[in-house]
């Protein structure tokens, strides 16, 4: 079968934009509500969000999650947004309420930080119908308990150790959806994909 040519239109004014590494297209992707997502931009910068070709946005930032911020990001984005709802300093009832609010705003999923308790993951899963995404920062974490608590996807963010963590998770849980940081270049991205990541977060 011959490969079909894909017509491209970049325009003039929008031609200057951020293009993610093409090798990300090699991962399987994760299908959410009928949309297949392979590349996820890690940013809350509205100018970048409007000028990047990622399939989705992950809006996690080092401050207490605020509905006004998630609403702004979701409102400006042309692609699905995964919203951080805490799990460290912000947790418990507040994280549960933030998850409900994020779903009502149109988020495609909620992301919880590594320190969050399994109890709160379960409580969030009970009240939202969008994916609950648990952040994994070490292969020493109890992955099984996260999944059993209700985490639908795993978000692996282990810096240089990310491929190793992904590989270990994939060996134990062949079917769990994994999104993972791809690192600074195509070599590290491909290593993460070959380790078993279904989607790549990029910053």
Residue spans of the language-model regions?
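Glycine-rich phosphate-binding active-site loops on the catalytic face of alpha/beta enzymes
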Residues: 105-116, 152-165, 195-203
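Active-site-adjacent beta->alpha loops and helix N-cap segments on the catalytic face
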Residues: 61-78, 90-95, 113-129, 139-143, ...
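Alpha/beta catalytic cores of nucleotide-metabolism and tRNA/nucleoside-modifying enzymes
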Residues: 2-16, 28, 179, 185-203
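Glycine- and small hydrophobic-enriched segments that form the cores of compact globular domains
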Residues: 83, 101, 108-114, 124
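Catalytic cores of alpha/beta
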Residues: 93-102, 141-149, 184-202
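Hydrophobic faces of well-ordered beta-strands that scaffold small-molecule active sites
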Residues: 28-36, 56-59, 81-85, 110-112, ...
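Conserved N-terminal beta1-alpha1 strand-loop-helix module at the mouth
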Residues: 1-83, 87-93, 104
């Amino acid at each position: 079968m011959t490969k079909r040519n894909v017509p491209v239109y970049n325009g003039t004014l929008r031609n200057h934009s951020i293009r993610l590494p093409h090798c990300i297209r090699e991962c399987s992707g994760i299908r959410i509500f009928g949309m297949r997502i392979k590349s996820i931009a890690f940013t809350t910068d509205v100018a970048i969000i409007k000028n990047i070709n990622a399939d989705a946005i992950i809006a996690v930032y080092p401050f207490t999650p605020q509905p006004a911020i998630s609403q702004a990001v979701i409102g400006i984005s042309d692609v699905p947004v995964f919203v951080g709802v805490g799990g460290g300093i912000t947790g418990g009832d507040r994280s549960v309420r933030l998850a409900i609010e994020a779903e009502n705003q149109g988020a495609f999923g909620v992301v919880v930080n590594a320190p969050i308790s399994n109890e709160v993951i379960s409580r969030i899963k009970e009240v939202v119908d969008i994916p609950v995404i648990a952040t994994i920062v070490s292969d020493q974490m109890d992955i099984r308990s996260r999944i059993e608590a209700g985490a639908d996807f795993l978000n692996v963010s282990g810096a240089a150790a990310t491929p190793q963590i992904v590989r270990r998770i994939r060996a134990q849980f062949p079917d769990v959806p994994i999104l993972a940081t791809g690192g600074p270049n195509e070599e590290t991205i491909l290593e993460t994909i070959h380790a078993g990541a279904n989607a790549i977060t990029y910053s």
